[in-house]
């Protein structure tokens, strides 16, 4: 069969030339590249997000907790952890209510579509008002639920709790001894919640002790780790005790975790895990180790709030420490108006004398113990002898501030005659300096080796220096019954020198008040002179002083005075014997009779030594 050629032009299909598949893949691979800068930025961004400071982390926690509170509608019904914990759990009824509300809204929208648009503006206005009323009602319901409570980190104010005390109003006083527990409480139950003394017995079974804590767990009413809550203890009568779930509605109670339903919602679990593991030692080099003093592993506890939590556990009660054997407790010697001896001395010194004194003290205090004169007097002895108040005050203050506690008291340094600066101040009759030195811890028992070996108390009592004797007797370590070289106590010196003339003031000495002060301070009236054996009654009879004898009868015990009236001296004479053996004259006969009668009425036996 012959082939017929087609009429007209003939189109022939040809394939378009293209690159090979291998070349295409190569081009695509060349376009791929690793962006190192972007990866480094993302890494830095991740580190900056996770390497936060403690303060930033706490802010993040507060923001998250506030968001959680708004989301879960955490309400503060009361300071009870059960209700607060119940608010964090899901409410099945609220879910059903939300679903029903959504279904109702869908139905209303469908009806509106069927009915078409509103006919006039009045219907639109009524519809808007109805929606506004519904929104207001929802807001009112939310307000009734209570204030939103942020669940951020809480720093409790921890205070040391006192020990068990039957009448516990406040902390046990410092140094108070432990109290014996009371087993029989029947005698204390008749006054309800209080007693006559105005305090409440915290161990009474009629009261339940609770403490409103910042913690929201129900089992943290009282802390047993040595700390108490910052809130005061709550006392409620036994009859009014209620279950911890009594104030919670049935709907709230159903949301409390039970043994059957003991799992938290997943969202809450994720939040808690993220909340607690966000900032740990492994994730950041700035992480802190757990607190060493609170017993918990949270990094935001105890020492993270230095102004609210203690650094170390505090004890509840402690007794006073025992001082070292060579230390003297320096207590200010205050007067009736509360002014110390230092203040009184400083008040009478002119400012110019103080300035001069401190300038001199700065150049003298280092060699105050070694720089002595021929009599062994130190610079303090010399200024005390001259009664230079400015230099005395300045040198004593400088020595007090530079004195080492373990060293001997520099104010008790004596010269070659055993005289201390205090003894020199007594000789100068400077009561302000004496009180000031006693306040600094100077000893009042030093004795001079001159004359008869008087102590400061002997010298003051023998010369009727009432204020000086009162200041010396106020010192605890004063030895009232110490004798001088003549064997006389301070009381014997006071009786012997009564009515005599003072060599410096040329005034008659009246020692009645000093005798009374000495006896009240513990002076023994039965001590006789070691050289003559005479007692205070012997000296009163020798002086022919009826008034003094009557005064001794009033300040001395009656039995003691009878004993003194019958005591004999080293010559074997009693007080009555002295009246009979002494030279008689008309001027003294009347006085002798009065003394004799008073001794007989006091129990004295006549002629006892010659019987």
Swiss-Prot record:
Q: Origin organism of this chain?
A: Caenorhabditis elegans
Q: Which residues form a coiled coil?
A: 91-149
Q: In which tissues is it expressed?
A: Expressed in the nervous system.
Q: Which example biological process does GO assign this protein?
A: regulation of transcription by RNA polymerase II
ANK repeat segments: 375-405, 417-446, 452-482, 486-527, 532-561
Provide the alphabetized UniProt keywords: ANK repeat, Coiled coil, Repeat
Q: What Pfam families has UniProt attached to this entry?
A: Ank_2
Function description: Acts downstream of the receptor complex composed of ilcr-1 and ilcr-2, which is a signaling complex that modulates neuronal activity and animal behavior in response to sensory neuron input. Mediates signaling of the complex.
Matching InterPro entries? Ankyrin_rpt (IPR002110), Ankyrin_rpt-contain_sf (IPR036770), iASPP (IPR028320)
Query: What family does the database annotate?
Result: Belongs to the iASPP family.
Q: What's this protein's name?
A: ANK repeat-containing protein nipk-1
Compositionally biased tracts (Polar residues)? 212-223, 239-255, 315-333
Lineage: superkingdom: Eukaryota
Basic and acidic residues bias spans: 97-131
Q: Where is this region: Disordered?
A: 92-167, 212-255, 280-333
């Amino acid at each position: 069969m012959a082939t017929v050629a087609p009429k007209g032009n003939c189109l022939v299909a040809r394939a378009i030339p293209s690159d090979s598949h291998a070349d295409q893949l190569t081009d695509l691979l060349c376009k791929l590249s690793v962006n190192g800068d972007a990866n480094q930025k993302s890494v830095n961004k991740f580190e900056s997000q996770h390497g936060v400071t403690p303060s930033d982390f706490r802010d993040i926690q507060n923001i998250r907790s506030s968001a959680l509170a708004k989301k879960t509608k955490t309400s503060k019904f009361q300071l009870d952890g059960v209700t607060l914990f119940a608010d964090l759990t899901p409410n099945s009824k609220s879910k059903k209510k939300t679903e029903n509300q959504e279904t109702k809204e869908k139905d209303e929208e469908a009806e509106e579509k069927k009915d078409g648009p509103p006919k006039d503006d009045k219907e639109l206005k009524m519809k808007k008002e109805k929606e506004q009323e519904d929104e207001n009602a929802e807001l009112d319901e939310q307000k009734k639920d209570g204030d939103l409570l942020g669940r951020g980190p809480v720093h409790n104010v921890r205070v040391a709790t006192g020990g068990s005390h039957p009448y516990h109003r406040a902390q046990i006083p410092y140094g108070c001894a432990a109290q014996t527990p009371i087993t029989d409480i029947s005698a204390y139950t008749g006054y309800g919640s209080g007693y006559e003394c105005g305090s409440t017995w915290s161990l009474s079974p009629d009261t339940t002790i609770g403490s409103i804590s910042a913690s929201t767990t129900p089992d943290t009413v009282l802390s047993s780790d040595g700390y108490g809550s910052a809130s005061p203890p709550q006392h409620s009568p036994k009859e009014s005790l209620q279950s911890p779930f009594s104030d919670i509605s049935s709907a709230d109670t159903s949301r409390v975790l039970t043994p059957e339903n003991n799992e938290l919602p997943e969202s809450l679990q994720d939040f808690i895990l993220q909340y607690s593991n966000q900032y740990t030692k492994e994730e950041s080099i700035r992480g802190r180790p757990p607190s060493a003093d609170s017993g918990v592993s949270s990094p935001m506890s105890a020492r993270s709030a230095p102004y609210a939590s203690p650094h170390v556990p505090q004890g509840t009660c402690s007794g006073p420490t025992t001082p070292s054997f060579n230390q003297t407790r320096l207590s200010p010697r205050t007067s009736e108006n509360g002014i110390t001896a230092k203040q009184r001395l400083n008040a009478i010194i002119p400012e110019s004398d103080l300035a001069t004194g401190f300038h001199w003290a700065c150049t003298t205090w280092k060699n105050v113990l070694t720089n002595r004169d021929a009599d062994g007097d130190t610079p303090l002895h010399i200024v005390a002898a001259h009664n230079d108040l400015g230099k005395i005050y300045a040198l004593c203050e400088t020595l007090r501030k530079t004195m080492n506690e373990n060293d001997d008291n520099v104010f008790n340094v004596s010269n070659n005659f055993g005289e201390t600066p205090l003894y020199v101040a007594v000789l100068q009759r400077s009561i302000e300096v004496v009180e000031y030195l006693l306040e600094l811890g100077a000893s009042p028992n030093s004795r001079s080796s001159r004359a008869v070996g008087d102590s400061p108390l002997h010298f003051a009592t023998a010369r009727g220096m009432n204020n000086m004797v009162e200041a010396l007797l106020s010192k605890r370590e004063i030895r009232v019954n110490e004798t001088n070289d003549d064997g006389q106590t301070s009381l014997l010196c006071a009786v012997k020198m009564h009515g005599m003339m003072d060599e410096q003031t040329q005034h008659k000495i009246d020692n009645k008040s000093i005798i009374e002060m000495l006896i009240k301070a513990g002076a023994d009236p039965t001590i006789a002179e070691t050289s003559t054996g005479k007692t205070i009654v012997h000296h009163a009879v020798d002086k022919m002083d009826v008034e003094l004898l009557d005064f001794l009868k009033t300040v001395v015990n009656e039995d003691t005075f009878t004993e003194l009236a019958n005591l004999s001296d080293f010559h074997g004479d009693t007080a009555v014997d002295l009246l009979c053996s002494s030279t008689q004259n008309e001027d003294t006969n009347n006085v002798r009779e009065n003394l004799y009668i008073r001794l007989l009425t006091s129990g004295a036996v006549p002629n006892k030594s010659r019987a």
